Amino acid sequence: MRVTTSFPLGTLRDTPSEAEIISHQLLLKGGYIRRVNSGIYAYMPIMLRVIEKISTIIEKELNNIYCSKLLLPQLHPAELWKKSERWEGYTAGEGIMFNLKDRQGKEFGLAPTHEEVITSIASEMINSYKQLPLCFYQIQTKFRDEIRPRFGLMRSREFIMKDAYSFHSSKEDLASFYEKMEKAYENIFKNCGLDTVGVDADSGAIGGAASKEFMVTADAGEDSILFTESGSYAANIEKAVSLPSKEIPLIRSHEEWIETPNQKSIVDICQNNNLDASQIIKVVIFLAKFEDKSEVPILACIRGDQNINEVKLFNLINKKYISNLIHLKIVDDNAIINKNLINFPLGFIGPDINDETIKINSSWDKSWIRIADYSASSLSIFVSGGNKVDFHKVFRAFSFIEKKFLISDIRNAKKGDCISQESNEELKEKRGIEIGHIFQLGQKYSEKLNAKFSDKNGQLKNLWMGCYGIGVTRIAQAAIEQNHDENGISWPIQISPFEILIIPTNLKDPIQKELTQEIYEEFISNQIDVLLDDRDDRAGVKFKDADLIGIPFQIIIGRDSINKEVEFFSRSSKSKIKIASKNLLEKFISESKVMYNKNS
């Protein structure tokens, strides 16, 4: 292709102010995307080639495990999502689904995911175990009503995604296919030239028994990954489990009151009372809002030197109670004032606080849901709130508290924790960008949408399901996070918009022009993915743009063209050699083969 006739470049000289991270900056500066509105981007021709190459890699691997490609509607009727009991959670409050009503007043949503639609289709087309297993996939645009779109294509309102859905006759068959998909994902990311790590993950709003995320390690990542150096364990921080450090024993012979004027924080209490944070149980109050409109106060206890993992807490509450949990929020001073909770001792609450403290409130449930992390429930002697302002007290043991607690892991694992009693391996931490997620959904959706099949004995059974997502546009941006320098992008060759860029420095020179045409035609005839920068512009501008857009190899045609010689430049290694034009194709094939093998 030629820049002047079929592939215009839209590079920028200045970095757009809204771009916070380097990959977003380079996508905009390189002319790959154009901002239309907050979180909404146009994919320019050069970006579309990257997307198409990623999509081709994905399709090849999925076709290898007998997945069938289809295209599902983006506009979903609300009744399907109400059957799965996800409509309220996805549309109310801080829900992420764009939703609307048509002129008949019927409700619809713009799809962030397609479990409901594909399950509805499966319920109509799958009748017998003889049709199973089946897997369908699509690559298309998804929508999320992000509260704060940021980081370009990392967190946008509109994005391209591959989502696949599998149907099975048994839990064992689902698990077997899940492993095949996991291997396919590893191949996909390797063939995209990415350095990824698979981690145990929370299933979130999608649900299911097991899930795994695939992360590109990068400083700009929004997710924290905890892992061991040996590679024996890796998990997203939302899912990670570990053992906290040992507490420092508190030496007190009996229960006693401690006056703590204006000492609401753990730091203040420790500094003023010669205590260590591990000797304190902090109590955090949450308000849980359920789909049935009920509001239930949550009393969560954890050791003072640890932090509550709100994802673990949310999932625990959601599993234990019948109605779907929609929202979980920390109760602060403003909430107490708004609810007119008189003399509510926020900041001084202990695990033994009575239900009477909340019975005055008309909208809240009249009793606490009490939850304690293992780090709190295992303490023998500790300090916690005294349930009256400016006072804490010493407790003899958590087990002596005459209240019913749900004991579970609601703690944030962190760097430096040991992974188990049997191992001294400590957790390390790094940042990651999620580019893929696979789930064993089980029968969650088939039960609610009545998707059944007839087994070998003629009995009707619910289908077993899996779902598998890849962020196509995220892969493109994540690849830039891993492959750039001070001059611009340095694409892995597998997903680069072109394999090689020809840069004539002066096309007004007839010798350069003739040699340029010869080289271009030779590469085209050998089916090399080549771009010719035939703009009537200064050589310096072309060189700067070439480094910015990041095509792996450059052929620079200059004054030595009179001797049929050119320069061959590798963008990643920055090596440049002078070479006879007759040897150029052979050189490119050799160098590109090395790069393909290195990145796959």
Swiss-Prot record:
It catalyses: tRNA(Pro) + L-proline + ATP = L-prolyl-tRNA(Pro) + AMP + diphosphate. Its EC number is 6.1.1.15. InterPro entries: aa-tRNA-synt_IIb (IPR002314), aa-tRNA-synth_II (IPR006195), aa-tRNA-synth_II/BPL/LPL (IPR045864), Anticodon-bd (IPR004154), Anticodon-bd_dom_sf (IPR036621), Pro-tRNA-ligase_IIa (IPR002316), Pro-tRNA-synth_IIa_bac-type (IPR004500), Pro-tRNA-Synthase_IIa_type1 (IPR023717). Gene3D superfamilies: Anticodon-binding domain, Bira Bifunctional Protein, Domain 2. This is Proline--tRNA ligase. It is an enzyme of class 6 (ligase). CDD domains: ProRS-INS. Homodimer. GO terms for biological process: prolyl-tRNA aminoacylation. Catalyzes the attachment of proline to tRNA(Pro) in a two-step reaction: proline is first activated by ATP to form Pro-AMP and then transferred to the acceptor end of tRNA(Pro). As ProRS can inadvertently accommodate and process non-cognate amino acids such as alanine and cysteine, to avoid such errors it has two additional distinct editing activities against alanine. One activity is designated as 'pretransfer' editing and involves the tRNA(Pro)-independent hydrolysis of activated Ala-AMP. It holds the Pfam family tRNA-synt_2b. Signal peptide: none annotated. GO terms for molecular function: aminoacyl-tRNA deacylase activity; ATP binding; proline-tRNA ligase activity. Keywords: Aminoacyl-tRNA synthetase, ATP-binding, Cytoplasm, Ligase, Nucleotide-binding, Protein biosynthesis. GO terms for cellular component: cytosol. NCBIfam families: PRK09194.1, proS_fam_II. Consists of three domains: the N-terminal catalytic domain, the editing domain and the C-terminal anticodon-binding domain. It is found in: Cytoplasm. Belongs to the class-II aminoacyl-tRNA synthetase family. ProS type 1 subfamily.
